[in-house]
UniProtKB/Swiss-Prot annotation:
Cofactor comment text: Binds 4 [4Fe-4S] cluster.
Role description: Required for electron transfer from ubiquinol, via NapC, to the periplasmic nitrate reductase NapAB complex.
4Fe-4S ferredoxin-type domain: residues covered: 63-92, 100-132, 141-177, 188-219
SUPFAM superfamilies associated with the record: 4Fe-4S ferredoxins
Pfam families, per database record: Fer4_7 (PF12838)
Gene from which this protein is expressed: napG
Predominant location category: periplasm
Keyword NAD: no
Localization annotation: Periplasm
GO molecular function: 4 iron, 4 sulfur cluster binding; metal ion binding
Keyword vocabulary terms for this entry: 4Fe-4S, Electron transport, Iron, Iron-sulfur, Metal-binding, Periplasm, Repeat, Signal, Transport
Protein name: Ferredoxin-type protein NapG
Length: 279
């Protein structure tokens, strides 16, 4: 005897509300985005803890950061041309714009190649291809930041930064000072001269301290710039061959060591002759 079972009708799933579907889709997308941001921030935090140093540009790079970033086409040819593997191509997590070349002096300084292959390989003008003298490059400026830990400031003869300088006695010299601790010895203080320092980074890389007391900083951080509105009187006098200010034109009170103040009489006004007046 055959028994025929009745088939159960399939239950239809209720249709998902379009608004609810849209909400779940947006929520999933937002959660994924936040997770990605968290990963990136974590990587950047780990990178910052690494304290890899100040990023510097290759020799003869355009000094203006915006101009360099605009001129660099991120081709990496300068990095490939460096025979010492000193240059790096920046990634998304690097301290400079992705795809641009940089180096960390504490890790690997510039070896000052006489033929400047990195600059010669640049096709865009971000690096000066016409440069011929590597000693004229200005990758940064050496600055002795920490006098409290520098061994020479403690009265010890370290002199390593001075000895490794490619332009010894020009870019870095040793200046003597009295040692107040012993009262009978001299301190030999490393002194950087900005007119000769190339910013190669050999001094920073060679510093014997765990954290270098001398560092290479970008020029805009290391050196103040005199505003265009300033005029140095002695320079203007040398250019003109005479003083540009009439004698006794400016009269300021004179304060004597005794504490008295002498106020000079006002000078006669000086009128410049009017051109074409014949006077």
């Amino acid at each position: 005897m055959k028994v025929r079972l009745k088939s159960k009708k399939k239950m239809k799933k209720p249709a998902l509300n379009p608004e609810r579907r849209k909400f779940l889709k947006e929520a999933t997308r937002t959660a994924g985005g936040l997770a990605g941001v968290g990963i990136l921030l974590g990587l950047q935090q780990n990178q910052s803890l690494a304290r890899e140093g100040v990023p510097l540009r290759p020799p003869f790079a355009l000094q203006d950061a915006k101009a360099f970033s605009a001129a660099c086409i991120r081709c990496g040819q300068c990095v490939q041309a460096c025979p010492y593997d000193m240059l790096h191509l920046a990634s998304l997590l690097s301290p400079v714009e992705a795809g641009t070349p940089y180096f960390i002096a504490r890790d690997k300084p510039c070896e000052m190649c006489p033929d400047i292959p990195c600059a010669k390989a640049c096709p865009s003008g971000a690096l000066d291809r016409q440069a011929t003298d590597i000693n004229e490059s200005r990758m940064g400026l050496s600055v002795l930041l920490d006098h409290e830990t520098c061994l020479n400031y403690q009265g010890l003869r370290c002199d390593v930064c001075y000895r490794v300088c490619p332009l010894i006695d020009k870019a870095i010299t040793l200046e003597t000072q009295h040692n107040p601790r012993s009262d009978k010895h001299a301190l030999f203080i490393p002194t950087v001269h900005s007119d000769a320092c190339t910013g190669c980074g050999k001094c920073e890389q060679a510093c014997v301290l765990e954290e270098a007391a001398i560092k290479i900083l970008p020029m805009d951080l290391a050196k103040g710039m005199l505003g265009k509105h300033y005029r140095l009187g002695w320079e203007e006098k040398a250019k003109a061959g005479h003083s540009l200010a009439p004698k006794d034109m400016i009269s300021l009170p004179t304060r004597t060591p005794e504490g008295t103040t002498v106020i000079p009489e006002p000078a006669e006004p000086v009128l410049a002759p009017i051109l074409g007046s014949g006077k």
